[in-house]
């Protein structure tokens, strides 16, 4: 009987992992904060694992999401792709250089501030505030953007300086509730790129950023003396694979969506969710 109960509990944990993978796959690419959503969802799902594992889990499952970008854009990102002309190969290498340049600010500040941010800003109130602040920012920027034509409508024409500026905006995503994609897309629009260019560059910028951050979290997890059981590895794998599969659809959806729409709806969603999170955090603080 005990074995049956343990098996049932393990299956439930795997189902929770599937659900969290779905949440990650959706929210990683939409500018609504994947980490903020995972923190909130896990509050109710109550994944029965240690806090250290959950903190690592929330970051490492992003690898599944970023693999979707590599699959969808493989030909475009691969400088060794058969059939590419010399000009196309050159543009691909230049694209990667722009990505590397954009990664520099977040790599520096991420290593410098990650532990402090996690210790002091990983709470409901910070998540709620950042959801609302960026929600308002999206609505305001999109309203302004209707009267301004983008300066950069082709990623190949985006300068290295513009790439660096977008990288500076990515630094803001260190704060929980901000959204990495939200910060970089908003930053791209502010510095003059079209929505599609900002979204494309956000996807590409996520490859080294998310691989690096996930690797850092995994290394810290083991350095702190934690181990990974077979069950935990399975939970991590199931969530990552789910995030990968869902991301394949979400990325394509977003790129089709922004051809005819702006990001205002996501701004409104962030504000509503931020208010809900703030209310929930206040209730939890008062009543425990």
From Swiss-Prot:
Q: Where are the transmembrane segments?
A: 25-45, 53-73, 93-113, 121-141, 171-191, 196-216, 231-251, 263-283
Q: Which domain of life is it from?
A: Bacteria
Q: What is its EC number?
A: 3.6.1.27
* Top EC class for this record: hydrolase
Instruction: Give the Gene Ontology MF terms in alphabetical order.
Output: undecaprenyl-diphosphatase activity
One GO cellular component assignment for this chain's record is: plasma membrane
Key words of the record: Antibiotic resistance, Cell membrane, Cell shape, Cell wall biogenesis/degradation, Hydrolase, Membrane, Peptidoglycan synthesis, Transmembrane, Transmembrane helix
Q: How does it sit in the membrane?
A: Multi-pass membrane protein
Q: Is rRNA processing found in the keyword set?
A: no
Q: What is its main location?
A: membrane
Q: Where in the cell is it found?
A: Cell membrane
Supply one GO BP term: regulation of cell shape
Q: Give the protein family.
A: Belongs to the UppP family.
Q: What does this protein do?
A: Catalyzes the dephosphorylation of undecaprenyl diphosphate (UPP). Confers resistance to bacitracin.
Name by which UniProt lists this protein: Undecaprenyl-diphosphatase
Q: Which organism is it from?
A: Streptococcus thermophilus (strain ATCC BAA-250 / LMG 18311)
Question: What's the name of its gene?
Answer: uppP
């Amino acid at each position: 009987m005990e074995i049956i109960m343990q098996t049932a509990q393990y299956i439930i944990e795997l189902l929770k992992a599937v659900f969290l993978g779905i949440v990650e796959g959706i929210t990683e690419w939409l500018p609504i904060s994947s980490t903020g959503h995972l923190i909130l969802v896990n509050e109710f799902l109550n994944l029965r694992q240690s806090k250290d594992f959950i903190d690592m889990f929330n970051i490492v499952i992003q690898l599944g999401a970023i693999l979707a970008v590599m699959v969808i854009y493989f030909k475009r990102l691969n400088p060794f792709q058969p059939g590419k002309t010399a000009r196309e190969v050159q543009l691909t290498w230049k694209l990667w250089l722009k990505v590397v340049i954009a990664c520099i600010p977040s790599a520096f500040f991420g290593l410098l501030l990650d532990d402090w941010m996690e210790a002091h800003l990983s709470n409901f109130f910070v998540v709620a505030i950042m959801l609302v602040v960026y929600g308002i920012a999206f609505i305001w920027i999109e309203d302004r953007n209707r009267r301004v034509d983008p300066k950069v409508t082709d990623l190949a024409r985006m300068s290295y300086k513009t790439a660096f500026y977008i990288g500076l905006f990515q630094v803001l995503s260190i704060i929980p509730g901000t959204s990495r994609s939200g910060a970089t897309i908003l930053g791209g629009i502010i510095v003059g790129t079209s929505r599609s260019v900002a979204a494309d560059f956000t996807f590409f910028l996520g490859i080294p950023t998310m691989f690096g951050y996930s690797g850092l979290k995994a290394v810290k997890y083991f350095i702190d003396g934690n181990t990974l059981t077979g069950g935990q590895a399975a939970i991590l794998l199931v969530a990552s694979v789910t995030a990968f599969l869902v991301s394949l659809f979400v990325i394509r959806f977003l790129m089709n969506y922004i051809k005819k729409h702006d990001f205002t709806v996501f701004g409104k969603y962030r504000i509503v969710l931020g208010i809900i999170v703030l209310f929930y955090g206040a209730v939890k603080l008062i009543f425990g």
